[in-house]
């Protein structure tokens, strides 16, 4: 597991209050992890803070799964 992946998953666990074993890469924030729209906004804000980046709204809307969050963070770091 990459450092980025570990950090993203840690944020998801903290923000959504879910168990580590529930945070699978294919998990949907809403359908699998029980997030609502406010949770997803707060999650994006936490990712922005952790990785010192700005995620535009049109990109944030596409971040709906754990893997999408990891992919975005990795691509923005390159």
Swiss-Prot record:
Subcellular location: Cytoplasm
GO terms, biological process: lipid A biosynthetic process
SUPFAM superfamilies in the record: ACP-like (SSF47336)
Keywords: Cytoplasm, Fatty acid biosynthesis, Fatty acid metabolism, Lipid biosynthesis, Lipid metabolism, Phosphopantetheine, Phosphoprotein
Pfam families given in the database record: PP-binding (PF00550)
Predominant cellular place of this UniProt entry's protein: cytoplasm
Post-translational note: 4'-phosphopantetheine is transferred from CoA to a specific serine of apo-ACP by AcpS. This modification is essential for activity because fatty acids are bound in thioester linkage to the sulfhydryl of the prosthetic group.
Domain Carrier, residue spans: 2-77
Entry GO MF terms: acyl binding; acyl carrier activity
A single Gene Ontology CC term: cytosol
Modified residues (O-(pantetheine 4'-phosphoryl)serine): 37
InterPro entries linked: ACP, ACP-like_sf, PP-bd_ACP, Ppantetheine_attach_site
Magnesium is among the record's keywords: no
Pathway as given in its UniProt record: Lipid metabolism; fatty acid biosynthesis
Gene3D superfamilies: ACP-like (1.10.1200.10)
Family that this chain belongs to: Belongs to the acyl carrier protein (ACP) family.
Entries under NCBIfam families matching the protein: acyl_carrier, PRK00982.1-2, PRK00982.1-3, PRK00982.1-4, PRK00982.1-5
Function: Carrier of the growing fatty acid chain in fatty acid biosynthesis. Is probably involved in the biosynthesis of docosahexaenoic acid (DHA) which is produced by this bacterium as a fatty acyl component in its membrane lipid.
Protein name per its UniProtKB record: Acyl carrier protein
Gene name in the database record: acpP
